[in-house]
Amino acid sequence: MPKFSLRTLLLLFFGFGIALAFVCQVIFPIREQARRCSCSNNIKQITLALLNCESVYGHLPIGIETSPDGSPYRSWRRLTFFYMEGLPPVFYDLYDENSAWDSKSNTRFYDGTPVVQTDKFGSNRRVDSLDPCPVSWCCPSDSTKRVNYAVVVGEETAFPPNRNVKFDEITDGLENTILVVETLSGSDKWTEPRDLQFDSMSFVISKSKNGEIGSRHPGGANVGFADGEVHFITDAISPEELRALLTIAGNEPITRQQLIDRGVIR
């Protein structure tokens, strides 16, 4: 067995330290940048799906539909099926619009029940189970496999309870109004009508599962605006500024461009 001098060992440890520092300072940030870019693309796709819904129906979908007894009934996410890339065709046909999200016919979207899937020509039949959180709804920086993209539900937002919003109601400007946010508070069942609640938010960018906008990305979170643009909001944004971007007709003297100019939004 070869013997190493103290000097050789010190040089080896020094070289290892340099290599480790290189990985931490160069490789890891590059990987995170790629994950953040993928997350931004997810939000872009979801935001454009909502804009397509608005174009087809003349209004945005209801964020959380409730039943007569007040319990959550359906989520806005199911209406994006037709406009999302990468979702299996079976999604378009299986969802039962006449029953609740957690009814027997709709639990197969997340409980592992085998379903028959085919390609768009009706061939290549196979039996499979659906992913409870499809990749389009999960941020690659979050390993928990939960829904990372939500809307903010509230009377002052684009998603008031049990009511559709038309774009002409967004008097603050489409470019100044957030539709889709990143969060760590999502469900592990992507069809569950569960989103962020405007009235209980503190309007800070968070790294906890506490009903706030937040992410695993260092320094902030991605959001999608009503004009289709996706931006990274840094945690330097004030609660007043973030709140203003979530209201549709608050008439606040705060614009996205001002925040971009200040470096608060990228």
Residues of each region from the PLM?
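Hydrophobic membrane-insertion alpha-helices, especially the h-region
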Residues: 9-24
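Surface-exposed loop/linker segments characteristic of extracytoplasmic
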Residues: 8, 25, 29-266
